[in-house]
């Protein structure tokens, strides 16, 4: 059985500290970087069960946050849909770079960019086990009870 997912939201109200260098690119700028595109596909292919969802999500991506290691190789990505509110669809960090705060930096920089651009909310859906990461980045879970509809007793 798969782990339950939670929905999260963040209302950016101030700039947050970012612990690692993160590039925040438009999707058009990102696709011009062929090595980074190949690296993202490689990571998505190995870390997620289905590539179909990624392919379905990609046409709506407006921004990509990228972290590069000291050699310049992209080792962390975050994809953003951006109609009015922003939706984070993928946060991907290569196995050898995990545990270094890269995911936190990608999320924090995305929240900062949202704040600077006047975006009202940033939302995402993720596994429940990642709740500490997203809460540390200023996100609040929308608990299932909050979505429940209670009928009045007769």
Where in this protein do the model-derived segments appear?
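Short beta-strand-to-coil "C-cap" segments at the C-terminal boundary of structured domains/repeats
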Residues: 10-14, 148-154
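Conserved GNAT acetyl-CoA-binding A-motif
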Residues: 114-126
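Conserved active-site alpha-helix within GNAT-family acetyltransferase domains
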Residues: 1, 127-151
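Conserved acetyl-CoA-binding loop-helix of GNAT-fold acetyltransferases
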Residues: 93, 99-112
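Short hydrophobic/aromatic beta-strand or adjacent loop that forms the aromatic wall/cage
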Residues: 3-8, 61-62, 144-148
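Short amphipathic alpha-helix that is part of the acyltransferase structural core
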Residues: 2-53, 68
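A conserved beta-strand-loop-helix scaffold within acyl/acetyltransferase catalytic domains
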Residues: 51-70, 74-92
């Amino acid at each position: 059985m798969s782990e339950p997912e939670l929905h999260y939201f963040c209302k950016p109200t101030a700039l947050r500290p970012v612990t690692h260098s993160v590039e925040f690119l438009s999707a058009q700028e990102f696709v011009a970087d062929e090595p980074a595109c190949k690296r993202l596909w490689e990571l998505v292919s190995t870390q997620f069960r289905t590539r179909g969802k990624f392919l379905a999500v990609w046409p709506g991506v407006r921004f990509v946050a990228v972290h590069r290691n000291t050699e310049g190789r992209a080792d962390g990505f975050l994809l953003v849909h951006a109609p009015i509110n922003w939706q984070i669809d993928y946060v991907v960090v290569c196995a050898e770079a995990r545990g270094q705060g890269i995911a936190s930096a990608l999320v924090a920089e995305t929240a900062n960019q949202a704040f600077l651009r006047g975006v009202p909310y940033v939302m995402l859906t993720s596994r429940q086990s990642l709740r500490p990461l997203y809460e540390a980045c200023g996100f609040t879970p929308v608990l299932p009870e909050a979505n429940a509809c209670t009928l009045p007793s007769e």
